């Protein structure tokens, strides 16, 4: 895949979208359905033809692109999103250095793909199976991501499944970010360029 500013912006918007949806789901128990579907589908796109193919099309990343443009500020909402972002990228770095973990992740995603021949991806059991990949493969690499939200919402099993599935989608986008050449220096020194690129993409969708 190409290592361009466009590709890095798309991948980073994917991480932003996952973090934003986790925040919304944890507080309200629901989030934008199309964006959620895009996030879950991205997990299964293990051999994409290009960066955008992971998400279907640019417009499927509208929430993530808007989130990137707004940037992360010092408000409680902004700092929480930043914490999720940093945590997801830190977990992906641990995963990248863990060959067994990458192998297990691939196997478990393959199992999900086979199960989808018989079940709908929105079934509670399927979402539970996707969430269990995060619990079994990603979470033990630590440190755990502390998700904050409405306690009564977070206690619901279906919300827990969806939050963990979204966190897994964030890891998938973080893997993509690394694959297209994304590095920490791009976040420190190239943030303004990514914001400008995100604005261009948003204007075209």
UniProtKB/Swiss-Prot annotation:
Assign the protein's first listed, main location to one coarse class.
cytoplasm
Q: Where found in the cell?
A: Cytoplasm; Cell inner membrane
**Protein origin, superkingdom:** Bacteria
Give the record's GO CC terms: cytoplasm; plasma membrane
Origin species, per record, is Aliivibrio fischeri (strain ATCC 700601 / ES114) (Vibrio fischeri)
* Keyword line: Cell inner membrane, Cell membrane, Cytoplasm, Membrane
Gene name?
hflD
Please state which protein family the record places this protein in.
Belongs to the HflD family.
Q: What is this protein called?
A: High frequency lysogenization protein HflD homolog
How does the entry describe its membrane topology?
Peripheral membrane protein
| Entry-linked InterPro entries | HflD (IPR007451), HflD-like_sf (IPR035932)
């Amino acid at each position: 895949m190409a290592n361009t500013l466009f590709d890095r912006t798309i991948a980073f918007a994917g991480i932003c979208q996952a973090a934003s949806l986790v925040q919304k789901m944890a507080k309200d128990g629901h989030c934008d359905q199309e964006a959620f579907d895009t996030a879950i589908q991205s997990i299964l796109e293990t051999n994409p033809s290009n960066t955008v193919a992971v998400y279907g099309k640019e417009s499927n990343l509208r929430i993530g692109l808007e989130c990137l443009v707004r940037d992360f500020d010092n408000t409680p909402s902004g700092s929480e999103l930043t914490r999720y972002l940093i945590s997801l990228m830190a977990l992906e770095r641990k995963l990248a250095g863990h060959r067994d973990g990458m192998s297990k992740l691939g196997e478990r995603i393959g199992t999900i793909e086979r199960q989808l021949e018989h079940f709908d991806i929105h079934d509670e059991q399927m979402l539970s199976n996707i969430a269990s990949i995060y619990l079994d493969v990603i979470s033990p690499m630590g440190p755990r991501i502390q998700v904050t939200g409405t306690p009564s919402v977070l206690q619901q099993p279906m919300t827990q499944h969806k939050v963990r599935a979204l966190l897994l989608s964030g890891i998938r986008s973080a893997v993509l970010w690394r694959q297209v050449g994304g590095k920490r220096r791009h976040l420190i020194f190239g943030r303004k360029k990514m914001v400008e690129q995100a604005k261009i993409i948003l204007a075209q969708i």
